[in-house]
Regions:
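A common structural junction motif
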Residues: 24-32
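Midchain, well-structured core segments that form catalytic/ion-binding scaffolds
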Residues: 1-18, 42
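Hydrophobic alpha-helix feature that most strongly marks membrane-spanning transmembrane helices
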Residues: 7, 28, 62, 84, ...
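His/Asp/Glu-rich mid-to-C-terminal helical/loop segments that flank catalytic regions of hydrolases
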Residues: 14-15, 20-25, 93-129
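Active-site-adjacent substrate-binding region
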Residues: 35, 39-94
Length: 129
């Protein structure tokens, strides 16, 4: 017997439903005499960031010459819960080797400075609006 968890994230709830159906279909199979039981432990709604705030961050990064891209985050950051109550967005800073939320995570001072600069200028844009 062994136990493991599977975390599925996507911005489209219909895609998540399909993923869950695929995972649940494992219960119908047997591998070398082993079976599988799937239990959905918890669920949360997809959170969408405030489009105006995202536009401020994007414009700020572009004006400062900071390389950027839009990504959807399914992570359970505090901002996810704040987004239900007030306009919210997030800025992610590049991590070495893409490692995040673990001991070897490292973001260079240059990348942190770029993230802070993008955030400061986005806040100033929001304040001027």
């Amino acid at each position: 017997f062994f136990d493991f968890s599977f975390d599925s994230r996507h911005e489209d709830p219909k895609v998540l439903e399909k993923v869950l159906a695929i995972i649940k279909s494992c219960e119908e199979k047997t591998w070398a005499g082993c079976t599988c039981k799937v239990e959905k432990a918890w669920n949360r709604d997809t959170v969408y960031w405030d489009k105006k705030l995202v536009s401020y961050v994007k414009a700020s990064a572009e004006e400062c010459g900071i390389k950027h891209q839009y990504i959807h985050s399914g992570a359970g950051h505090d901002a996810q819960f704040a987004a239900y109550m007030l306009p919210t967005t997030m800025i992610f800073v590049q991590s070495k080797d893409g490692l995040s939320h673990c001991e070897p995570e490292y973001s260079s001072p240059e990348h942190c400075t770029e993230g802070a600069t993008a955030m400061l200028n986005a806040v100033l844009k929001a304040d001027n609006d």
